[in-house]
UniProtKB/Swiss-Prot annotation:
It holds the Pfam family PCRF. Residues 286-315 are annotated as: Disordered. GO terms for cellular component: cytoplasm. Its main location: cytoplasm. It is found in: Cytoplasm. Methylated by PrmC. Methylation increases the termination efficiency of RF1. Keywords: Cytoplasm, Methylation, Protein biosynthesis. It comes from Idiomarina loihiensis (strain ATCC BAA-735 / DSM 15497 / L2-TR). Peptide chain release factor 1 directs the termination of translation in response to the peptide chain termination codons UAG and UAA. GO terms for molecular function: translation release factor activity, codon specific. This is Peptide chain release factor 1. It comes from the Bacteria.
């Protein structure tokens, strides 16, 4: 049987589902595109949990009918009732588990696109090369999922890869999966320039920030912003020598700096840089709030802090280890070609288990 508090919550969701269903048929809602889109999204989110709850209620009715039948004078009917009751109880357990997962608190950012930031850390040129490997891995993962990747800014490494690269990843549910990639990534391998065959260790930092819609973005006082323009470097032919199209935004109160030079238009570069800046400031505010809440439960969503090592890629052993859940796979080639769901599926399962534990603690 479901916990009474969970059942009350589900009944409230059924009422809201019916309310949203009625609202979607009203002319003033249909004519308001933003409201209609918002309610449609809420309706589709409620639909699955309400459908599952209806199955659960039907299951309870089936069990009650089977219990009545189990008291019949006919032995054959009693045997049939016992079999039905056994099957219904098994289905009840599965439905309860499904409902609990559907009721887990959802991150409102999960369905959003995101900004991916990769920075080379310790290890010099080898760290920059590894940053390039990570970006290629994420690009292939995005391709497998039908997501789009656009580079916002990039600083090339001297011998390949990137000292820093920022990209925009767009598609359904991008942030919900990519957010688990934030943190320190370490590589152990023999560099091509190493004549003695010694294994070197290098590191990169990955930060994943949700793209905040303009209507919800943090307001930035223009007086708090320093804007610098400069000539773009890299590909672009003569154009890069003629115009100061590159933009550097500095948010003075926080010291956050964002550069963008990928577009030929200064206006477009500024818009992209502002979106990244707003995402970073939002992240700072979220981290501050989280610290104030002082959560004692582990958080599998990384902060992007370089000191927070989340994964090691060992080339000689073809091994990849995720330190948050002590998962080791000897399938490095598959992971590097974009099959990171091998790791992410396990992390998300663990994350949901942590949330379920917190949910049950709150009901005790």
């Amino acid at each position: 049987m479901l916990n009474p508090s969970i059942e009350r919550k589900l009944e409230g969701l059924v009422e809201r589902y019916q309310e949203v269903q009625a609202l979607l048929g009203e002319p003033d809602v249909i004519s308001d595109q933003n409201r209609f889109r918002s309610l449609s999204r809420e309706y589709s989110q409620l639909e699955e949990v309400v459908g599952c709850f209806e199955e659960y209620r039907q299951n309870q009715d089936d069990q009650a009918a089977a219990k009545d039948m189990a008291e019949d004078d006919d032995a054959e009917m009693r045997e049939m009732a016992e079999e039905e009751l056994k099957e219904a109880r098994k289905a009840e357990e599965e439905l309860e588990n499904r409902l609990q997962l559907l009721l887990l608190p959802k991150d409102p950012n999960d369905d959003r696109s995101c900004y991916l930031e990769i920075r080379a850390g310790a290890g010099g040129d080898e760290a920059s090369i590894f940053a390039g490997d990570l970006f290629r891995m994420y690009s292939r993962y995005a391709e497998k999922n039908g997501w789009k990747v656009n580079i916002v800014s990039a600083s090339d490494g001297e011998h390949g890869g990137y000292k820093e690269i920022i990209a925009h990843m767009s598609g359904d549910g991008v942030y919900g999966r990519m957010k688990f990639e934030s943190g320190g990534h370490r590589v152990q391998r023999v560099p091509e320039t190493e004549s003695q065959g010694r294994i070197h260790t290098s590191a990169c930092t990955v930060a994943v920030l949700p793209e905040i819609p303009e209507a919800e973005a943090v307001e930035i006082n223009p007086a708090d912003l320093r804007v610098d323009t400069y000539r773009a470097s890299g590909a672009g032919g003569q154009h890069v020598n003629r115009t100061d199209s590159a933009i550097r935004l500095t948010h003075i109160p926080t010291g956050v700096v964002v550069e963008c030079q990928e577009e030929r238009s200064q206006h477009k570069n500024r818009a992209k840089a502002m979106s990244v800046l707003q995402a970073r400031i939002q992240r700072l505010e979220d981290e501050k709030r989280q610290a104030e809440e002082d959560s004692t439960r582990r958080n599998l969503v990384g902060s992007g802090d370089r000191s927070e090592r989340i994964r090691t890629y060992n080339y000689p052993q073809s091994r990849v280890t995720d330190h948050r859940i002590n998962l080791t796979l000897y399938r490095l080639d598959e992971v590097l070609t974009g099959d990171i769901d091998l790791i992410l599926d396990a992390i998300i399962t663990e994350h949901q288990a942590d949330q379920l534990a917190a949910l049950s603690e709150g009901q005790q």
